[in-house]
Regions:
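A residue-level structural signature of the nucleotidyltransferase/glycosyltransferase Rossmann-like core
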Residues: 62, 114, 212-213, 285, ...
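Conserved core of the sugar-phosphate nucleotidyltransferase
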Residues: 126-254, 276
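Left-handed beta-helix
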Residues: 1-9, 217-376
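Short coil/turn connectors at secondary-structure junctions
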Residues: 8-10, 58-59, 81-82, 109-112, ...
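Residue-level signal for inorganic ion chemistry
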Residues: 45, 101, 120, 163, ...
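A short acidic, often aromatic-flanked loop/helix-cap motif at beta-alpha or helix-coil junctions
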Residues: 91-96, 155-157, 194-195, 284-285
Length: 376
């Protein structure tokens, strides 16, 4: 039995095919949130790759995106081999992406251990994250555990799913004690209301479900075979052509539209009995919509967060973002409260913070309008 994972057998799958519609008008189909540099000089995807490079060689990192975004992904990630940048023909939720990732890894190494990570998370404490991920790699390499990284809640958030953790797991015989604490996963729960979330946080027995998973190729395919046999069959077919980009693209174009659209949480994580939670004791954030930016931008005395030449009178708790690339002029505001104001070269968004989730509905209306769909 392995006591730790070999570097050459470590792989990372970064899921980067989302559209980030709640960050419209800056996030577009060809340049979505994960490809934007909202908080620094690098995009979220570039930062996600940089975080794992100390643990995994570039040749073992795969990016799963879509055809519209593939050119920009290639441009942003010159160190990642082109054949490792794979486009889904159509979005079929996270189970399909995980299945594709498993086929890609298995074609390289059937003894491989892979981490599946989102492209758009904010993780300032990189060293702590790397320690947890490394320990999770080692645990997944030792046996049949499905490891998920759970984040210790800092507030009763209602926008995340939660994981109920059970007893702390002892260090396996012959293995070194890790810095990371591992728990048995008792159950996954959907996004709660505020009162329930408060109970979860106060109990200390729940973690945020961050959508980060670590497992061996053998473990995840065994799980798919048991709980999602159709996905397992697809994985077997894709495995055979995974090292031939042209054949893989042709196969995916034919088969992907018929693949069941289901999340990996529902398809596998909620059903499996061998799930272990790695305690993610590091600062973490999932920027789901514009209001989340206020957690990372410096605010003025009235609580306004501005990335703009901004002047105001009697305005408070607003997010002002000027993304124009030319003809930038001051943005002047009077009497505005708790709002989002975003300006790009071709569009302006004004929304109340409490309605930020409805920006996705707005994008659908734009897409349905022949004159305005170019803005999506």
């Amino acid at each position: 039995m392995k006591t730790q994972s070999d570097l050459k057998d470590r792989f990372v799958i970064i899921m980067a095919g989302g559209r980030g519609e709640r960050f419209w008008p800056l996030s577009r189909e060809k340049m979505p949130k994960q490809l934007l540099a909202l908080l620094g000089k690098k995009s979220f995807l570039q930062e996600a790759v940089d975080r794992v490079l100390p643990l995994v060689p570039a040749k073992n990192i795969f990016i799963i995106t879509n055809a519209a975004q593939l050119p920009e992904v290639r441009k942003q990630l010159p160190k990642i081999p082109k054949q490792n940048l794979v486009a889904e023909p159509i979005g079929r939720d996270t189970c399909a992406a995980v299945t594709l990732g498993a086929a890609l890894v298995g074609a390289r190494s059937t003894t491989g251990v892979m981490a599946v990570l989102p492209a758009d998370h904010v993780i300032p404490e990189e060293k702590k994250f790397q320690q947890v991920l490394s320990d999770a790699f080692d645990l997944a390499a030792r046996g049949q555990a499905i490891v998920t990284i759970g984040i210790k809640p800092t507030e009763p958030a209602t926008g995340y799913g939660y994981i109920h953790v059970g007893q702390e797991l002892p260090t396996p015989p012959g293995a070194k004690k890790t810095k990371t604490t591992f728990f048995k996963a008792e159950r996954f729960v959907e996004k709660p209301n505020y009162e329930t979330a408060l109970e979860y946080v106060n109990s200390g027995q729940y973690r945020w479900n961050a959508g980060m998973f670590v497992w061996s190729f053998i473990t995840v395919t065994n799980g798919l075979e048991k709980h999602q046999p159709e996905m397992f069959a697809a994985c077997q077919r894709w495995f055979k052509v995974a090292n031939n980009p042209a054949k893989l693209a042709k196969t995916l174009a034919k088969e992907y539209p018929e693949i069941k659209k289901v999340s990996i949480d529902y398809a596998l994580m909620e059903k499996a009995q061998n799930v272990v939670v790695a305690d993610g004791a590091f600062e973490w954030d999932d920027l789901g919509a514009w209001p989340a930016l206020s957690r990372h931008l410096k605010a003025d005395a009235e609580g306004n967060c501005a990335v703009a030449d901004f002047i105001h009178v009697d305005a408070a708790r607003n997010i002002i973002f000027d993304a124009r690339t030319k003809n930038r002029t001051p943005i002047a505001v009077v009497g505005l409260r708790d709002s989002i104001l975003v300006q790009t070269d071709d569009a302006v968004l004004l929304a109340h913070k409490s309605q930020a989730q409805k920006i996705k509905e707005l994008v659908k209306k734009l897409a349905a309008d022949p004159k305005l769909k170019k803005l999506v």
